[in-house]
Regions:
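Beta-strand elements of well-folded, non-transmembrane domains
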Residues: 87-89, 103-105, 138-140, 163-165
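Intrinsic-disorder/low-complexity, polar/charged segments enriched in Ser/Thr/Lys/Arg/Asp/Glu/Gln
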Residues: 78-82, 129-133, 166-168
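A broad, low-specificity signal marking well-ordered, structured residues that form hydrophobic/aromatic
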Residues: 45, 97, 116
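Secreted, periplasmic, or luminal enzymes acting at the cell surface/secretory milieu
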Residues: 1-94, 149, 154-162, 171-185
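Intrinsically disordered, low-complexity Pro/Gly/Ser/Thr-rich segments with frequent PxxP/GP/PP motifs
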Residues: 107-144
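Short acidic, flexible loop segments centered on an aromatic residue
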Residues: 90-108, 113
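Residue-level recognition of conserved beta-strand edge/terminus positions
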Residues: 82, 100-102, 133, 160
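Residue-level signal for secondary-structure boundary sites
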Residues: 55, 91, 107, 142-144, ...
Length: 185
């Protein structure tokens, strides 16, 4: 890859810019040698999201119903998403369920995806299944603006399971954006 020739070591911007193709799996649009979260198994897995989620959520309701976190909105629970993982091969293996959020919400440029939760399942035998619960908070859905504030934006979201992905589910956040955490200025 010629990535190292494209980015100055002095440029610390994560987001893509005029002379920067973007850093990390969230922003880089080129072809990676190994994608973030890449792993090899001696078997094949399939996944199915078994949690029934709403199609739409009002941001005001999500933030108003959060009383259990001592006023820290970013810690508010959003959803506990159950993912049934099946070992479709013959070899016993562990599996790490990676939950990413993707979508074009908030100001451009938009990250390709963001890792928001993961869970390792141990020793899934061939032909067997196990369930991973991915716990999402409002911070899982938020983006950090240029001032360092965590903001929950309205828009269309997709929860992706694994890199390919093996499963996905879509939902929409509606209403006005909400500041979850303000960075000291």
């Amino acid at each position: 890859s010629n990535y190292i020739a494209k980015v100055s070591m002095m440029d610390m911007n994560m987001r893509p810019g005029e002379n920067n193709p973007g850093r990390t799996y969230k922003w880089y649009n080129g072809s990676a040698v190994y994608e973030f979260g890449h792993g090899l198994h001696y078997t094949n897995f399939s996944a199915n999201i078994t949690t029934q989620m709403q199609n739409s959520y009002a941001i005001s309701a999500l933030t108003q119903n959060c009383n259990s976190t001592g006023g820290f909105l970013e810690r508010c629970p959003f959803a506990a998403v159950d993912v049934e993982v099946s070992n479709d091969g013959d070899v016993t293996s562990d599996y790490v369920a990676l939950g990413y959020i993707a979508g074009e919400f908030g100001p451009a440029p938009h990250p390709k995806k963001s890792l928001v939760s993961y869970k390792r399942l141990h020793n899934i035998t061939g032909g067997a299944s196990d369930t991973a619960t991915l716990n999402l908070t409002l911070a899982s859905l938020a983006r950090v603006d240029e001032m360092g504030n965590k903001v929950l934006y309205p828009g269309d979201y997709t929860l992706l399971i694994d890199n390919h992905p093996l499963a996905s589910i879509n939902f929409t956040l509606t209403g006005e954006q909400a500041m979850l955490d303000m960075w000291p200025q």
